[in-house]
Amino acid sequence: MAASARRASQLLGSAASRLLHARGFAAAAAAAPSPAVFVDKSTRVICQGITGKNGTFHTEQAIEYGTTMVGGVTPKKGGTEHLGLPVFNSVAEAKAETKANASVIYVPPPFAAAAIMEAMEAELDLVVCITEGIPQHDMVKVKAALNKQSKTRLIGPNCPGIIKPGECKIGIMPGYIHKPGRVGIVSRSGTLTYEAVFQTTAVGLGQSTCVGIGGDPFNGTNFVDCLEKFVDDPQTEGIVLIGEIGGTAEEDAAAFIQESKTQKPVVAFIAGLTAPPGRRMGHAGAIVSGGKGTAQDKIKALREAGVTVVESPAKIGSTMFEIFKQRGMLE
């Protein structure tokens, strides 16, 4: 009788302990402030497509960088482990078990839109889709679903991802070129993002957060979404914007910069100055059509908003450094 009483007491104690732990976790989660620009060291990430070649490689890289990777999703492989992380059959299961609030998607193009929708239905705060070549018809449906909700933010698709140097890397960017610092970078081009990162690191300014928004016509996060965050972020003292031909995203960014009256210096580069009309230049969205979306139009709009537009990507870092110097912003 005494033994069974002791056992009951232990079970009750264990249950109470679990309850207190859960309450403590919930309180900590509630107390944690939202990241200034989408991610920080508290971001808990799962990988959709974790057991595939790309998912495996980039999850290893993220773990090595220090990102809080908490699990992965591969249908029919739930209950297994991969890279020391639990694998689940669905995003909803993964979120319930790991308290993840972000996902990165390395899923082949025919299935990527469904993966995005699944992450949205699980109401993750952030979904980063790296996949290139998703059918535009699929992305129209995703965009419509995104616009009907306010819980989930999508970055991408067809993008390098997002990184807060030294804290959280979600995507395919090389971590070692980044340095925690003062410049926020937002770009439609992956490789030009790396160029801007390398240069701002080389001149000693570093980066606050870098966001690759992707080069597809239908993406989840645009220049203005990122600029709003950078303008309000105290760590971001300068902004680099890298655009390209096609669409009106850069003109919208110029209008926002003008309206915001921000005093933070903005340096921009627009790719595709010599692109012939009607020809797609690398990205699905990089096309001048109907006489609209030219580099000249974008450069003009940005300069009228007070942005310093450089003619060559090689000048991004040195130009930002000179502006910091002129304004007495260098320590």
Swiss-Prot record:
What this protein is called in its record is Succinate--CoA ligase [ADP-forming] subunit alpha, mitochondrial
The organism's taxonomy opens as:
Eukaryota, Viridiplantae, Streptophyta, Embryophyta, Tracheophyta
Q: What is its main location?
A: mitochondrion
Protein family (similarity comment):
Belongs to the succinate/malate CoA ligase alpha subunit family.
Transit peptide region: 1-25
Q: What class of enzyme is it?
A: ligase
Residue numbers annotated as active site? 283 (tele-phosphohistidine intermediate)
Quote the record's binding site residues for CoA: 51-54, 77, 130-132
Task: Tell me the route in metabolism or biology where this protein functions.
Answer: Carbohydrate metabolism; tricarboxylic acid cycle; succinate from succinyl-CoA (ligase route): step 1/1
Q: Name one GO molecular function term.
A: succinate-CoA ligase (GDP-forming) activity
